[in-house]
Structures are given as C-alpha cells and as structure tokens.
C-alpha cells in the first residue's frame, strides 16, 4: 500500500518485490519514491515460474532504477531435472536480463538459505565458479563488480538519500 511504501522509504528500508503478486509489485513500484529490488527472482521468459519476473516486470524495475538479482535456485532457472540445473542455466538468466534491462539493473543471489544451489555453485565454497563463468561469458571486471553487489549498493545508497530528504521535509 501507499502508506507502507511511504513508511519504508521514510526509514530508508529497501523494498523487495520478490514474492508479491504482479499487481502488488506494480503498485509498490508506482508508490515508491526510491528504487526497489527483487532479491531473488529470475527471468520468466526462460523459466515460467510464478516467482520469476516477466519482461514487463523487469522493465518496471529498470524504469524505477532498481535491481533484479537472479538466483541460483534450480527451480527458478529450469524445469529440467536431468541433468540438474547448472552454471550455464544461471548464466543464461544473467545474460537474458542484462540484454533486456541492462547491466546496471541486474545482480546475483545464491538463495542458499532458501534451498538454492546448482551444479557448480552448491555453496559458498564454490562462489569463485560464478566469477569464472561470468568471465567466460565476456563480462568485464567492472560489470562483474556491478553484478556481485555494486548495483545493490547503488540502490541502497539511493534509498538512504531519499530517506534523508524525506526526513528533512524535502520530499
């Protein structure tokens, strides 16, 4: 709702759109004065999963200045069981979203605490495999920095700046 979005903006809390309905996501983005994040969602165009974002939703996040963090949760990446979801599936979602909404609006999420993990990135000890796969796909060091947290930190800074302006009565 508008009250909730306004309160979250006022206190500098990032709004996460990963679980709500499409209509609720649209409303939250429209009502937020700050960029939003999808902390663990992938591309519905590649895997029709209800938690993934469709192209229209991806564009809403881009227009809002936010970030969508694709997640290494196999069920969000593919419906294929054999072979099990792997690094190529994960990279395909990153590539798709970067192509669709730009490098500044995409990030990486493991979702290890929610059952995440794929062949090649089952736990934190295999995290370097993600960076290696990004390099193999042609991403530059600066692009990899954005994907690994730079974009999320940018949004956090913007959320904090908007909160400060709201608290000062400037917004």
Model-identified regions with their sequence ranges:
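Active-site beta-loop-alpha junctions enriched in small/polar residues
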Residues: 13, 18-23, 41-44, 73-75, ...
């Amino acid at each position: 709702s508008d009250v909730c979005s306004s309160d979250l903006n006022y206190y500098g809390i990032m709004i996460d759109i990963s679980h709500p309905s499409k209509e609720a996501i649209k409303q939250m983005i429209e009502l937020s004065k700050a960029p939003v994040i999808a902390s663990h969602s992938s591309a519905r165009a590649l895997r029709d999963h209800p938690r993934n974002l469709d192209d229209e939703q991806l564009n809403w996040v881009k227009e809002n200045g936010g970030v969508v963090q694709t997640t290494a949760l196999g069920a969000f990446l593919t419906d294929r069981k054999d072979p099990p979801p792997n690094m190529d599936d994960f990279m395909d979602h990153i590539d798709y979203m970067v192509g669709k909404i730009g490098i500044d609006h995409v990030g990486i999420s493991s979702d290890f605490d929610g059952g995440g993990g794929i062949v090649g990135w089952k736990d934190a000890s295999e995290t370097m495999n993600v960076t290696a796969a990004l390099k193999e796909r042609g991403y530059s060091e600066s692009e990899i920095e954005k994907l690994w947290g730079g974009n999320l930190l940018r949004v956090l800074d913007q959320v904090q700046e908007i909160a400060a302006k709201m608290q000062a009565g400037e917004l």
